[in-house]
């Protein structure tokens, strides 16, 4: 859809802020945390990590200018190819490359851990390396966007949320149609072995073994998300209150119960 600014197009997918495309660039209003994110994007560019947007400056309206990554985001309903085994392996490799690129990024005090982050700090986690922030082109993952909640933590913290959204580790398992994906209720006899296989594929492609406490980390991550949504809403943040009103909080609470009940079937 066209915005109030001529020749700009509002991009879909954001829960918290509006994002506009202008030619080969993306424009977003500056936030208090924007300068530190610009440092991160500059670091990634200097390290040759080609999957993130490049920070190009500030426009005449006081908005940040980022390079536009051509393709489509993993917005719901997902395309069938977005949940293929080959794509999952490529996402694992992309996350590994991100972690390698930030391995020497200075963990400045201005970057804070998100709720429930384990204390073992290894890298600056993206913290939202999720299917809806991955850009696909020619049916392959080609980019990762939205670094707004980046913060220090262990690499497995990123891996846990990536797998939750990209595998997915969910009470509704993807069922393929000709083009898009619809979801059916999880059936252990049908889906447990598929999830187990995809977990193995991801960790093999990432290059590390799955830790024994992996599912506890996934649960910790989802519980932290619930904590964040409730706290932000209580502080008067309308975007997070909208998430509650639209059922996001209840959804994640139900997912936590589901993983506690069925997660042992995947390990």
Q: Where in this protein do the model-derived segments appear?
A:
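ATP-binding glycine-rich loop module of kinase domains
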Residues: 2-43, 57, 65-67, 74-81
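Active-site acidic catalytic loop and adjacent metal/ATP-binding pocket
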Residues: 17-21, 113-161, 171-174
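Conserved HxN/HPN-centered segment at the entrance to the catalytic loop
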Residues: 45-58
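Conserved kinase catalytic-core helix
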Residues: 77-111, 115, 122-127, 132-137, ...
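Short linear capping/connector segments at secondary-structure termini
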Residues: 110-116, 179-184
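Active-site activation/catalytic loop segments of kinase-like enzymes and analogous catalytic loops
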Residues: 159-207, 222-236
């Amino acid at each position: 859809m066209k915005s109030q600014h001529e020749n700009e197009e509002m991009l879909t997918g954001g829960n918290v802020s509006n994002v506009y495309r202008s030619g080969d660039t993306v424009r977003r209003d500056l936030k208090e945390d924007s300068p530190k994110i610009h440092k991160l994007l500059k670091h990634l560019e200097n390290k040759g990590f080609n999957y993130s947007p490049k920070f190009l400056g500030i426009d005449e309206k006081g908005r940040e200018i980022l390079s536009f990554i051509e393709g489509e985001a993993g917005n719901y309903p997902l395309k069938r190819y977005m949940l293929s085994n080959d794509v999952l392996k490529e996402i694992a490799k992309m996350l590994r490359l991100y972690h390698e690129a930030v391995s020497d990024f200075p963990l400045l005090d201005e970057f804070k851990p998100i709720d429930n982050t384990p204390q073992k700090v290894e890298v600056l986690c993206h913290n939202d390396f999720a299917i809806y922030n991955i850009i696909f082109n020619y049916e392959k993952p080609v980019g990762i966007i939205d670094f707004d909640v980046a913060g220090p933590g262990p690499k497995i913290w990123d891996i846990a949320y990536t797998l939750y959204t990209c595998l997915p580790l969910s009470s509704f398992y993807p069922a393929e149609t000709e083009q898009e994906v619809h979801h059916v209720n999880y059936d252990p006899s049908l889906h447990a072995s598929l999830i187990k296989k995809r977990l193995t594929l991801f960790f093999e492609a990432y290059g590390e073994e799955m830790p024994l406490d992996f599912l506890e980390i996934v649960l910790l991550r989802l519980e932290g998300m619930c904590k964040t949504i409730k706290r932000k809403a209580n502080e008067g943040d309308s975007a997070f209150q909208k998430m509650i009103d639209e059922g996001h909080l209840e959804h994640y609470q139900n997912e936590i119960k589901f993983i506690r009940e069925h997660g042992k079937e995947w390990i």
